């Protein structure tokens, strides 16, 4: 059930960001019901592979992630809050490491998430930034040779 509260001061924004951090670090198929406690009903989610809007679509992104990577997990390495905590929507950045298994090997992907929170502290915009070429494609045997070749062609000298 949604709780109505104000999230317009630095302390309440920090508390909400810590709640978001805890959610991502304990994310599992059984915790997906908590999405509605964190995201607004029309929230937008974008990463290098998709752009979706609304709680059902965001939940589907995570359901798919667990369907193809059942043992994946996030570790939030840091949180940066905007210099002006009263800015609406409040904007923050989470630096993270995503751990997954590719061809029997545990690998990590480094990235960050840009979050915008409304006055009630719900995420209204979630944008993931990470280098799919370096962090994923180069780790896939079928594409790694192509990515190395492209890197050599593009690099100066």
Language model feature labels by segment:
Residues 15, 19, 57, 107:
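Soluble or luminal CAZymes and related metallo-dependent hydrolases
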Residues 32-89:
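A solvent-exposed, acidic/Ser-Thr-rich amphipathic alpha-helical stretch
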Residues 1-33, 37, 153, 157:
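Short, low-complexity N-terminal intrinsically disordered segments enriched in polar/charged residues
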Residues 7, 22, 45-48, 102:
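A general structural-boundary detector
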Residues 12-22, 47, 69-71, 124:
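Short, mixed-charge, low-aromatic patches
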Residues 2-4, 67-73, 79-157:
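A beta-strand edge to alpha-helix "cap/lid" segment located at domain peripheries
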């Amino acid at each position: 059930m949604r709780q109505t509260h104000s999230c317009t001061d630095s302390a309440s924004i920090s508390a909400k960001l810590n709640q978001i951090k805890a959610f991502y670090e304990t994310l599992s198929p059984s915790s997906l019901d908590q999405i509605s406690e964190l995201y607004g009903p029309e929230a937008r989610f974008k990463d290098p592979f998709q752009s979706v809007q609304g709680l059902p679509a965001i939940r589907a992104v995570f359901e798919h992630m667990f369907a193809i990577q059942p043992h994946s997990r996030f570790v939030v390495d840091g949180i940066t809050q905007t210099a002006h905590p009263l800015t609406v929507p409040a904007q923050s950045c989470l630096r993270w490491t995503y751990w997954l298994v590719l061809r029997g090997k545990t690998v990590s992907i480094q990235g960050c998430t840009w979050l915008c929170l409304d006055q009630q502290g719900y995420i209204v915009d979630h944008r993931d930034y990470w280098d799919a070429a370096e962090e994923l494609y180069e780790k896939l045997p079928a594409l790694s040779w192509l990515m190395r070749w492209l890197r050599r062609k593009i690099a100066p000298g």
